[in-house]
Amino acid sequence: ANTYQLQVDVDTAEFFMMALVLVALLLKLDKEKLFKWKGRIIYTLVSCMIFAGFTQVYVYSDYLENIGVDFRVYRPQYKYRYYGTLLTTMRTFGYLHVTQPKDYSVSAVKKITKQYTDSNSTESTETKKPNIIAIMNESFADLKEVGDLQVSQDYMPFFRKLKENTIKGYTYSSVFGGNTANSEFEFMTGNTLAFLPDNSVPYQLFLRSKTAGLTHTLKNQGYSPCYALHPFYKTGYSRYKVYPLMGFDKFYTSDNFSVFTDTVNYHITDSEDYKKLISLYENRTDKDKPFYLFNVTMQNHGSYDGSTLETGDDVQIEGDLQSYSKAEQYLNMIKMSDNALKELVHYFEKVDEPTVIVFFGDHQPDLEEDFYNKLLHTDIQKLEGEELEKLYKVPFLIWANYDIKEENVERTSNNYLSTYLAEVAGIKKTGYLEYLTKLREEIPAINAIGYWDKNGKFYEVDDKKSPYYELIHQYNLLEYNNLFGKDDQQKEFFYIKN
């Protein structure tokens, strides 16, 4: 986003200087014929062979990983610093190709989907379906869950106290400090980043046609209108292209807010965001139909400059980490988010229509690496497996303004949140949602790092010795068919029949 600060280091400056020299040489050479046509052919062939060999070794093989060069990290920008722009960029190309899962075939997929498409999902007995509001809150995280953080007062008191008619707990994201769109992708489609290339963004790389997911599921059951709201530019992560493919009727952006709208850290506040949300709800045209809105907030977006908020800093970091003003600024922004959530819940408490709100953070904040090192008492660049997952843990809740069974969820992941939502709202599930509901009983959480089984044991995604390897492989087959199956996509499994 446009609030990040650009810092040019020595390596970057050298790279641009070399690039300028190279361009100058090419312009010079263009004016002179150095080789005859036979020589040019030879040099072209040799160049192609060198390039092919380079890409085979450095892009598509495991050579770099075998010598200890690891690009699979939570913050890829650090790899550009450590390994250089050329090598990191070239290696990234290898991650953009999605390999067809082993033993993939349409018949193999049908064998899995048959039991779900043959059975009939039960639909709610409610005479009126509830309105559904899904909020993915920018960088909303609980840093106390990462390490021993001492603060002067709680920064999310309302979130913690909200228990009545509430399902809450922690969900695991597949991204850290950025790539927000990947969290919403997992939530809205039920797919996981575990089977997609590292550092890829499906919105920008893979979604080119109608995309199965929560919005189409709700539309096919009478939800209208189905809105998306994001108080920033529409072009971010190609949302203006992707949201129609997902089934949204209209996409509201910062263009739909007044220039006098309150901001913090250059972004529209959650309070103003929710006022727009309420306005869209109150002024919808189809008031006889259930309402659905998906909201991606912006308030807590980085970068953080450590400045004092205009509202005053109420939360102060104490102890060894008190010098980190950026983290302190962030925590005070989270408290603002908590207050805005309280206002939103209090509003819908008074609404007569049944309404469900699902709320979750997209990822943890992009704060100083040294802050996280001290918070965790280790070098976060060396974290692996379950220890690394501490950086992917964010809070979530599902609240209703009517009676539902309260539940505390120790851990889940973004791809499963829609299954909890479907159960609370009483909506009819697709075969895919039924499958995910059953899968979460055995594998309650999965993300790009790995997964936990029902007993709390952690596994890497590609661990072939895991007793759940076959279940994971089946999930991979289904996701591949969903995203890349084209004409072979099992539509009766991924969509509700009209």
Residue ranges with predicted function:
Residues 116-130, 134-137, 142-498:
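Solvent-exposed soluble domains appended to multi-pass membrane proteins
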Residues 6-8, 114, 458:
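Hydrophobic transmembrane signal anchors and adjacent membrane-proximal interface regions, especially
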